[in-house]
C-alpha cells in the first residue's frame, strides 16, 4: 500500500478529475470545482452555476456532484486506487486515494466517456424484462435509494407520462424557468465553442445556423403544447420509464442518489441502452407530492425520472477545460 506522489508528478490525478467532469448536470451547467492536493481530491459545489428557477434547493446540483464522485471512484478502480469518501452536511466531498494492487477494476470505468443523454426519438424496441432487471440489480447499492421501472403500455407508465405533461404546463408558464433555460442554450457552433457548457444546438438536434435565425425559433417553441407534443412522441418511442427515489431528502442523500444514478446510466451505456431525463414531475413540488400518492411511495422521495430504450448515438455535450474547474496544489 503506497501513498500518492506529489500531484505534479502523477498524471493519474488529472485522469480522475477528467472522468469526474464527464458526469451529467442540469442544463450542462457543470456546477463543480475540484481541488487536488497530495492524496486527496475535494469536490465542492460551484453555486455560480446554480439553476434557481428549476432547482431552487440545489437538489439536482448535488446529485450532479454525486455523479461526478461516482465517475471518479470508478475510474480510480481502473488505476488501482482505493477510495475513501467523506461527505459534509454542506455538500463538500473529500476523496482520499491510496494506490493498492488488490483493487479490482470496474468495467464501468471504460464507458464513462461513452455515456450521453440521448434526447432523440428512440426506435420503439423494448428492453427484455430479465435484462432490465439484471441491469437494475447491478446498479443498486445499500444507501436506501430505489430504482423502479415502468414498462411502456402499463398503467403507471401512462400516469408518469401525464405527470410529465403537467410538469411542462407548469414550467412553460413560468417566465423565470424559460429565461433560465434560454440562458443555457448555445444556439450554434460558434456559441457552443465559446462557452463549452450549456445545451448546444447539436445535442438538441438543431442545425448549425446563425443565432439570429435559431434564437427566435427556440423562444417560440417554449410553450407547453409544443413541448408536450415533442415529449409525448419521445416517451412513446421509449421502452420504459425509470424512477429513482430516496428515503431522505437532504444534501448527503442527493449526493448518494447521484452516485446511484450515474452508476445506472453507465450500466445502461455498457448494455447499449439510451437514456434521457423526464425530471419535470420531480422539479415541480406539487407534482412531486402527487407522484408519491399515485405510485404509493408516500415514505420515499422522487428524485430522478428517466426514459430508456434503444436509439442511435447523438452529439455529446461540451465540457469546460479542466483548468477552469480545478486547482492542483503542490505539496
Locate the predicted segments by residue.
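Acidic, surface-exposed loops and disordered segments
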Residues: 1-331
Amino acid at each position: 500500500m503506497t501513498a500518492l506522489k506529489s500531484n505534479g508528478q502523477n498524471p493519474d490525478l488529472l485522469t480522475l478529475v477528467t472522468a469526474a467532469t464527464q458526469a451529467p448536470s442540469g442544463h450542462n451547467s457543470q456546477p463543480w470545482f475540484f481541488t487536488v492536493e497530495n492524496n486527496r481530491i475535494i469536490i465542492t459545489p460551484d453555486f455560480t452555476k446554480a439553476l434557481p428557477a428549476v432547482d431552487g434547493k440545489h437538489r439536482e446540483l448535488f446529485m450532479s456532484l454525486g455523479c461526478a464522485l461516482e465517475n471518479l471512484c470508478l475510474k480510480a478502480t481502473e488505476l488501482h486506487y482505493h477510495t475513501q469518501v467523506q461527505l459534509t452536511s454542506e455538500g463538500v466531498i473529500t476523496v482520499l486515494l491510496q494506490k493498492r494492487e488488490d483493487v479490482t477494476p470496474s468495467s464501468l470505468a471504460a464507458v464513462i466517456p461513452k455515456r450521453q443523454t440521448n434526447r432523440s426519438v428512440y426506435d420503439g424496441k423494448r428492453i427484455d424484462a430479465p435484462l432490465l432487471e439484471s441491469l437494475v440489480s447491478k446498479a443498486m447499492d445499500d444507501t436506501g435509494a430505489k430504482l423502479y421501472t415502468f414498462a411502456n403500455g402499463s398503467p403507471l407508465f401512462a400516469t408518469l407520462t401525464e405527470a410529465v405533461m403537467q410538469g411542462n404546463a407548469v414550467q412553460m408558464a413560468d417566465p423565470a424557468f424559460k429565461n433560465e433555460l434560454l440562458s443555457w442554450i448555445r444556439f450554434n457552433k460558434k456559441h457552443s465553442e465559446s462557452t463549452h457548457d450549456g445545451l448546444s444546438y447539436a445535442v438538441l438536434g438543431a442545425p448549425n445556423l446563425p443565432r439570429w435565425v435559431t434564437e427566435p425559433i427556440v423562444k417560440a417553441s417554449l410553450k407547453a403544447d409544443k413541448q408536450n407534443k415533442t415529449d409525448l412522441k419521445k416517451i412513446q418511442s421509449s421502452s420504459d420509464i425509470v424512477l429513482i427515489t430516496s428515503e431522505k431528502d437532504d444534501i448527503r442523500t442527493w449526493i448518494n442518489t447521484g452516485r446511484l444514478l450515474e452508476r445506472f446510466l453507465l450500466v445502461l451505456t455498457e448494455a447499449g441502452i439510451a437514456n434521457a431525463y423526464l425530471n419535470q414531475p420531480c422539479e415541480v413540488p406539487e407534482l412531486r407530492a402527487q407522484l408519491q400518492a399515485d405510485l404509493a411511495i408516500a415514505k420515499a422521495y422522487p428524485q430522478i425520472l428517466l426514459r430508456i430504450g434503444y436509439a442511435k448515438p447523438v452529439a455529446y455535450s461540451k465540457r469546460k477545460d479542466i483548468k477552469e474547474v480545478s486547482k492542483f496544489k503542490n505539496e
